[in-house]
């Protein structure tokens, strides 16, 4: 692998600009070589002066890069030392509390199930769990910084070696010895000490001296491009997708020959439409994940996932394919119910019952950690006023806004099975009384309108909670206003629908109000999409016209196409209103909803790419590469104490009590190395040391 590719694959995306600009140096060298005057047409002194002038400029650029790297490394190292001191302080506090409450001086307390613990013990258990997670994330940040150190040194060595080869000199090697090999970022070994200290703390204080267990917790995933999925996962993805495509073709033929009347067709469509949208969403989310990884958008950090264990795009494709097969088989079974002994109404219940069980399955199988993460996130979304709102919380609520048809179809299914289904008819999903008009998919009783407003309500209260936490009217109250327009749109749509059915004279008034609020809502959301969520139309965009100063995806055309797509689909309701207002044929609204619901899921899929890109660029601006997890917040006095601590000989002091560590193995930054640390640590990221210039 060429070093440029290796560097690109292994850098920390949020620190991209802080690495040595290896490609720029290469371009300088090749450009100087191409533009050099020929000895055949000019004298040798002119050639020497040309290269001397170039070398002066080249080494000045090297000095600037070296200063940049030294500064960034020093800042990150100081930040790591402060963070380590904070974690030490929090660990000491937890140990002191435990000692006072139970008389146990270490974490080797008797093992009891969490549900048997007292309230104080539960709090302590949570603190220890948070500390383990915090040390794990901190360890990852140390490895990233060590990787930064190694990559930059190798980059300087490679480019200076190339300089000497092209210019046929040894001044590059001399410059490296004089400047790079004595640079603070290379000579400073405190990062290795911090790594050893962290391993010792986690092993001795958090894992009862079990080093194997500690290192398993601290294990850092391979730094670089996404690792290939296991062969069996790839096989299952191909198998499931192939079967799903084949079953869809079969469904198409079966639908032509098996469906008979509208009374049979539309209950099936409404019940199975939501399942299809969910499968489409999972598949497109897999494409999102693949695109983020390829472009270097760190979605793992943005969603605050566990970097050591999370779903890849192949896993999402596998889940979508598997559920897609079940969906097709269930629908096919409904088509062939007349020749089956199982009543038709059993198949939808079995399908969605399995989906629910798959999600809440308590056994540690079938992506248990990812499912548990999703369940916790759903709980936080539906209890938004009572929790601080993070990115993953409002991202998921935004997805629910595009999946509102699923909630409406779920409401329809519950209503249909409860009030309309003719249970003694096993061959078709028929209403109990064919003479009575269907009411479950209408707004007559207001329940459907309420269900349709639930996703917008969740985002609305999330915005209010964020305003409460930050006291910033912009953007949070303004964003809440955006979601409030949905309430008016749905309300007047429901009033128009019910008044139209009853031939009221004021129907046209509600129609115009519906159209008015649709226009307001679409313009509001479109502007917010482009300007706030995507960060486009930046006045400092420079050559990226109508975009922003920095873009991640390689082609500008992606952004322009996304803008056009967002405008079209944000105003797709105009087609729906035009058709429903000018025709009185039954089920026209259902047909349009069935067509436009997948398009809305696709619009959200495109939105996801640029929303996460914008969040990623914010992280890059803050050089935030790992989660910042803390057990106890620091007040101003604590922060001052931690800053002063770095110059004290006795290390960290407890912030509740003015005392030092009293354990045999002090974990002060200045303590002697442990005997167990004399062994070489297998934590460094390997840098390919290829001297073959063809590979550089």
UniProtKB/Swiss-Prot annotation:
It comes from the Eukaryota. Residues 2-224 form the SPX domain. The modification Phosphothreonine is found at residue 690. It is a multi-pass membrane protein. It catalyses: phosphate(in) = phosphate(out). Phosphate binds at residues 398, 401, 482-483, 570, 603-604. Keywords: Cell membrane, Host cell receptor for virus entry, Membrane, Phosphoprotein, Receptor, Transmembrane, Transmembrane helix. Residues 158-165 are annotated as: Important for inositol polyphosphate binding. Belongs to the SYG1 (TC 2.A.94) family. Homodimer. This is Solute carrier family 53 member 1. It comes from Mus spretus (Western Mediterranean mouse).
